[in-house]
Amino acid sequence: MTTPAKLTTGDIRGHLIGQTLPTTFGVAALMSVALLNAYYIGKLGSEELAAVAFIFPVVIALSSLGVGVMVGINSVIARSLGAGDVAQAARRANFGAVFAVAAGTALGLILYLLIGPLFRLMQASPALLPLIHEYMAPYALGLPLLLLQMALGGVLRGQGEAKVSSLIQLGYALANWALNPILITGALGFGGLGLSGAAYAMIAGNAVSCALSLLFIARTPLPINPALIRECRMGESARAIVSVAGPAALSNAVNPIGLSVLTALLASEGQAAVAGFGAAGRLQSFAVVPLLALSGSIGAIVGQNWGAGETGRARLALREAWMFCLIYGFGVGAVLFVWGDWFGSLFSQDPAVIAQFSSYMAISVWGYAGFGLLIVANGALNAVGRSSIALAQSFARVVLLMLPFAELLRGAWGAEAIYGAELFANLGGGLLAVWIAWRVLAAHKPAALA
């Protein structure tokens, strides 16, 4: 299926399109699962929805860890292939898979034992704890599968197999589309399991993803063969992956944390502001899917060329990706700016909510391009082993730009200060990320792969 380091030759723009387009469909498929979950859980009742509100931050944190593992494996494999060391790439692929299962098992057991204390610490009421346990118990035991499917995704993405990765994501989505109505609310004569059904559907989806991944990986130059683990220098392999995975996981978690703080600040501006902000955020999450896909695709292209010493091609890929961010970001922003009221009316009939929705759209959409610049820069930095810089950029965007702006101006501007804070952080963070990432890629000193 794969020619090693196939992204080190050929047209860069063609590679960007070929990697990003299928990834866009894959990301959209995953997002559809989240919407489907929300729909069926909403049919269970208000208590179940309240339980999910407590569960969501924990799931986001653990998903961020999985993304970090995927990015770390992607990075080391892409650079090894670029350097022409297929044997090392194969060792790292197999070590990464075993590492993911081991980490998932350890974390899953810890989480299972701490479900009660953790959610009591989060101030979950006694009435909600049984519902939370319904979901979190199977989720915790299924954590090894979650991290394994992320790791296998990293093996494929590091080889530039974006189309295959997207097919696997679609397989995950199809499994959930089929199982969610049956396992959550009940269908086809089955009574439904409630919240635990949502967790079991996710586990089944991850099992499908793992099976498909192993099937496709077996046809690449990096098949999963645990016997290769014996040839690895364990400590060095772990450091190579964790040095990227750790900061990447934290970087991925920073933005949701920042948005949670903004939501808390917005609560003082009234329920309509919170509702409008939340509804607009759901629309925004779909609007930026191509930017998210591009940030996930840039890694294999930059990583392989960086490992091969093709600094010029790596920088060209980054420049072309940034141009897309500017064109798409401002283009889709203009559409949402013009049609803000109409989109708002799709989410609510309350004039106050629609007004806040439109106000948020009128301000925040002009920052999409900057957000794209930042996440693409971070994807490139992770690919070349500079994930600590990517983490610093994400941290600076939220902690040094977004939150101070919102807090300082909230008294004078109200809700618009919070909307403006997101715009300021995206534009400022994006420009800073461009300056830093371009300088890093100009100095060709690849991080050691050991």
Question: How would you label these PLM feature ranges?
Answer:
Residues 32-50, 119-126, 182-193, 249, ...:
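Helix-terminus/linker motif at the lipid-water interface of multi-pass membrane proteins
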Residues 70, 74, 139-158, 165-173, ...:
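Short runs within selected transmembrane alpha-helices of multi-pass transporters and secretion channels
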Residues 49-109, 146-165, 276-340, 371-390:
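Small-residue-rich hydrophobic transmembrane alpha-helices
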Residues 35-39, 109, 117, 151-155, ...:
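Alpha-helical transmembrane segments of multipass membrane proteins
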Residues 1-23, 77-144, 175, 190-246, ...:
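Short alpha-helical transmembrane segments in multi-pass integral membrane proteins
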Residues 14, 29-30, 66-67, 107, ...:
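Alpha-helical transmembrane segments of multi-pass membrane transport proteins
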Residues 13-32, 36, 58-65, 141, ...:
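Residue-level signal for short hydrophobic patches within transmembrane helices
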Residues 18-34, 138, 172, 205-209, ...:
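Transmembrane helical elements of multi-pass membrane transporters/channels
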